[in-house]
């Protein structure tokens, strides 16, 4: 189980990302349309003034149950340990153990 502070930090980053998403898209669109260097400079300063944690690259996927940051499956949002346990307990519909 990951530390609760790490899980809370990740949730806070997710909220900030959603809050500033439209502003960030608008500024990036204006940046690509701008032709003057001074105008691009002003827009880039506005982009840099946004909170650092609102950038989508600062997010990490975490397991929904344990908070583990490594070995996550995007389709389920679970780490490999939890995925295996839940699949063996038949808690994931449509997931079967392969055999050949």
UniProtKB/Swiss-Prot annotation:
Protein localization: Plastid, Chloroplast
Keywords: Chloroplast, Plastid, Ribonucleoprotein, Ribosomal protein, RNA-binding, rRNA-binding
Coarse class of the protein's main subcellular location: plastid
GO molecular function, one term: structural constituent of ribosome
SUPFAM superfamilies reported for this sequence: Glucocorticoid receptor-like (DNA-binding domain)
Single Gene Ontology BP annotation: translation
Keyword RNA-binding part of the UniProt annotation: yes
Presence of the UniProt keyword rRNA-binding in the record: yes
Cellular component, GO annotation: chloroplast; small ribosomal subunit
Signal sequence range: none
InterPro entries: Ribosomal_uS14, Ribosomal_uS14_bac/plastid, Ribosomal_uS14_CS
Function: Binds 16S rRNA, required for the assembly of 30S particles.
HAMAP family found in the cross-reference section: Ribosomal_uS14_1
Record PANTHER family: 30S RIBOSOMAL PROTEIN S14, SMALL RIBOSOMAL SUBUNIT PROTEIN US14M
Subunit-level organization: Part of the 30S ribosomal subunit.
Family: Belongs to the universal ribosomal protein uS14 family.
Name this polypeptide is given: Small ribosomal subunit protein uS14c
Lineage: Eukaryota, Viridiplantae, Streptophyta, Embryophyta, Tracheophyta
Recorded name of the encoding gene: rps14
């Amino acid at each position: 189980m990951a530390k609760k502070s790490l899980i809370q930090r990740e949730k806070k980053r997710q909220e900030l990302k959603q809050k500033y998403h439209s502003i960030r898209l608008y500024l990036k669109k204006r940046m690509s349309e701008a032709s003057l260097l001074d105008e691009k400079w002003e827009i880039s300063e506005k982009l840099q003034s946004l909170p650092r944690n609102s950038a989508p690259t600062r997010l990490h996927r975490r397991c929904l149950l344990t908070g583990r940051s490594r070995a996550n499956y995007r389709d389920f949002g679970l780490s490999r340990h939890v995925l295996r346990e839940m699949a063996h307990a038949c808690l994931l519909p449509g997931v079967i153990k392969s055999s050949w």
